[in-house]
């Protein structure tokens, strides 16, 4: 009986340790820190997207929704209400399309852009009232440790 309990305890401890290690890995790999510009008013909860367009695509947000071989890598999380200067992080725990994990992203040069989808009536990244960042050209690698920082500075007019 004692051996059975000891075996169960060790197995449980190993599982907890493995999960903690995996959680730590998600914080160490490629991640995006998106903040709300201090000049903007507080925002309600919404869907936060980061679009990564390879090559010379200057406005990645306009590529959201493409599928198949032309699909643009996009990360998404449900964002809490944001105060000016506050933000959210998108990392390996975020939903990603068209890949299964962010680790599958091919290293290279990308234009990246953040979009905060707030319009509940029109579910489109280009909907009036949504916020977005300026595009940023950056070298991305799934193994990089330094975060990519983006600031939501613009609003799509109503």
Residue ranges, per PLM feature:
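A short tyrosine-centered beta-strand micro-motif
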Residues: 105-119
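Short beta-strand elements
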Residues: 124-158
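Bacterial N-terminal signal peptides
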Residues: 5-15
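Short amphipathic, basic-aromatic surface patches that mediate peripheral association
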Residues: 32-41, 54-60
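Boundary at the C-terminal end of the N-terminal hydrophobic targeting segment
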Residues: 15-23
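A beta-strand/beta-hairpin structural motif
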Residues: 79-101
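Contiguous segments within soluble domain cores/interaction surfaces
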Residues: 48-85
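Short acidic/polar inter-strand loop motif in beta-rich domains
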Residues: 56-59, 116-132
């Amino acid at each position: 009986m004692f051996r059975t309990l000891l075996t169960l305890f060790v197995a449980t401890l190993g599982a907890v340790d493995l999960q903690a290690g995996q959680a730590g890995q998600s914080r160490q790999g490629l991640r995006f820190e998106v903040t709300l510009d201090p000049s903007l008013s507080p925002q309600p909860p919404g869907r936060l997207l980061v679009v990564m367009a390879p090559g010379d695509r200057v406005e990645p947000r306009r590529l959201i929704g493409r599928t198949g071989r032309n699909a643009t890598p996009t990360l998404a999380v449900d964002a809490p209400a944001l105060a000016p200067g506050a933000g959210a992080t998108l990392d390996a725990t975020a939903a990603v399309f068209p890949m299964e994990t962010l680790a599958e992203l091919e290293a290279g040069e990308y234009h990246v852009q953040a979009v905060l989808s707030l319009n509940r009536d029109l579910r489109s990244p280009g909907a009036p009232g949504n916020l977005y960042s300026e595009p940023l050209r950056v070298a991305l690698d799934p193994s990089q440790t330094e975060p990519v920082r983006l600031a939501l500075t613009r609003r799509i007019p109503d």
